[in-house]
A protein has these predicted regions:
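N-terminal chloroplast transit peptides
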Residues: 1-41
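Pseudouridine synthases involved in rRNA/tRNA modification
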Residues: 2-7, 37-42, 46-127, 136, ...
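RNA pseudouridine synthases
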Residues: 49, 54-63, 131, 184-195, ...
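A generic structural signal for ordered alpha-helices
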Residues: 90, 101, 167-173, 194, ...
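Eukaryotic helix-linker segments that join adjacent hydrophobic helices
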Residues: 126-137, 147-204, 208-211, 232
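Amphipathic alpha-helical scaffolds
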Residues: 140-143
Length: 477
């Protein structure tokens, strides 16, 4: 089987897929000064899958950012032309993920440039951001793949083809399909290699607004404690490891070796995060978390009061947001426990403060007062505090994902198929109810919500750190 035959079919899919849904890059700034330019005059032979990611487009509301998009200029036919990833745009571009099967070996940067008509500097930026992945063998296509895509996948992964590739000898197909990040522009990719290119990585403009040195709580030989700002990622995303707390804190401290992530808090959450200075301490801290030697306290600003005491739910074991929780035990679902230690009435944040932190209005009916709760997190599930409080009818202020569902359940008790007033009678009714309930949730917050990791301690308090006052207190008298 010749790789070219697969290429033709996949290029056809590309032209009928992505380019029919979104603007192609039909022309771009000539890079005559680049030594790589000669490579892009050749006809592309690459096999190309293309898709638009189903993830939601998230826009930043930070008005102070330079409004420069990733696609900064426009050609005569209205299509965008790519330039550089910096300066950071104030808005994320439309999702675009490209899937390639390499037909001719060579440096990865050159191959992506000629296959996708992208400028070398832009592709180099993507690689630096961690937005390009490879696998020795093309992974299994998703259920949504077309018959033509399935056919081509079978062609390039046929045993007769794979048996001729020395790079995968001794590996199972599953092992060879594992994806790894491309780390260098000159990295060689052989024919048959699969590439995934996140052309529009998720951006974090807030990283460029923060005085990172002022957010450092402690520096030791083994770790750094950071007061993470809301609207930032602790260790980066699958398509952007550059715009992260670990990267910017490392630079602020002048470290030559980047800090390492030991645990996560949501992008929209602020507060204490421990970053390891060495791989050894990263492993040590992970062990402390597993052994439950790390204690985390949160401050949550809720729209309704929360009862003092331990709250227990069970979280659906599906790694997709929003996270659904049940009051009743369900086999296979994850136990979620938190302890509400305090709950006091406070003023609802004033409009100026809300605007400063891009707090989204999810139309909670009463905004006269809010409630500040101190919470001891007893289990550490993704979105746990947000999901549990919303399930109690006390969503977090600004939580545009979970508050709409809480409002819907409050207005029409029984919509939540896992709540007190569930109404379904059969399993088929339940499936339909779950689907409808899932649709009641909103989008992920753009910057901040009323949630702070206010304290972190371990080894029975031998190491104890506190964050600064949460954002919502800055407007209080």
């Amino acid at each position: 089987m010749k790789m070219g035959s697969a290429s033709a079919g996949l290029v056809s899919i590309f032209s009928n897929g992505y380019r029919s849904l979104s603007a192609p890059v039909s022309s771009w700034r000539t890079l005559a000064s680049s030594s790589l330019y000669k490579h892009y005059k050749r006809n592309s032979k690459s096999a190309v899958f293309s898709c638009l990611s189903s993830s939601k487009i998230e826009l930043s509301c930070l008005s102070s950012k330079v409004d420069v998009a990733q696609t900064t200029t426009t050609s005569v036919n209205g299509y965008h032309k790519y330039d550089r990833l910096l300066p950071c745009p104030s808005e994320n571009g439309p999702p675009r993920v490209e899937h390639l099967v390499v037909s001719e070996g060579g440096p990865v940067l050159e191959y992506i440039c000629k296959s996708l008509d992208l400028p070398p500097l832009f592709v180099a930026d993507l690689i630096h951001f961690g937005a390009v992945y490879y696998a020795l063998v093309c992974p299994q296509p998703p259920p949504s793949a077309t018959p033509e895509q399935i056919r081509i996948f079978k062609e390039v992964t046929a045993p007769s083809v794979l048996s001729k590739r020395t790079s995968i000898k001794g590996k199972t197909v599953r092992e060879a399909q594992k994806t790894f990040r491309i780390t260098h522009v000159e990295q060689f990719v052989e024919a048959g290699t699969y590439l995934r290119v996140h052309v529009h990585p998720k951006r974090f403009p807030r990283c460029y607004e923060i005085d990172w040195k002022s957010r450092i709580i402690a520096v030791t030989d083994s770790y750094v404690v950071l007061d993470k700002p809301a609207g930032t990622s602790v260790g980066g995303t699958s398509d952007n490891i550059e715009e992260s707390c670990a990267t910017f804190a490392s630079r602020a401290l002048g470290f030559s070796t980047p800090l390492k992530t030991t645990h996560q808090i949501d992008n929209c959450t602020e507060g204490c995060v421990v970053l390891a200075r060495t791989k050894e301490y990263c492993s040590i801290f992970h062990g402390k978390i597993r052994e439950k030697k790390v204690k985390k306290l949160y401050l949550a600003l809720t729209a309704a009061p929360v009862p003092i005491g331990i709250i227990t739910h069970y979280m659906r074991p599906i790694n997709v947001a929003p996270r659904l929780v049940s009051e009743d035990f369900i086999k296979g679902w994850y136990l979620c426990k938190l302890e509400v230690m305090e709950c006091k009435e406070v003023p609802w944040p004033d409009p100026v403060i809300q605007q400063k932190y891009c707090i989204e209005d999810s139309e909670w009916p009463s905004k006269d007062r809010a409630y500040e709760c101190k919470i001891n997190l007893l289990t550490g599930r993704t979105h746990q505090v947000r999901a549990q409080l919303a399930a109690c009818g006390a969503p977090i202020v600004g939580d545009s994902m979970y508050m709409p569902a809480a409002i819907a359940e409050m207005a029409n008790p029984g919509l939540n198929p896992f709540g007190k007033y569930k109404k379904y009678t059969t399993e088929s009714d339940k499936e339909m109810t779950v689907t409808k309930w899932f649709a009641r949730f909103g989008k992920e917050p753009k910057v901040a919500i009323g949630l702070q990791a206010c304290e972190i301690s371990w080894d029975d308090g031998e190491h104890f750190y506190e964050a600064r006052s949460p954002w919502w207190r800055s407007g209080m008298a």
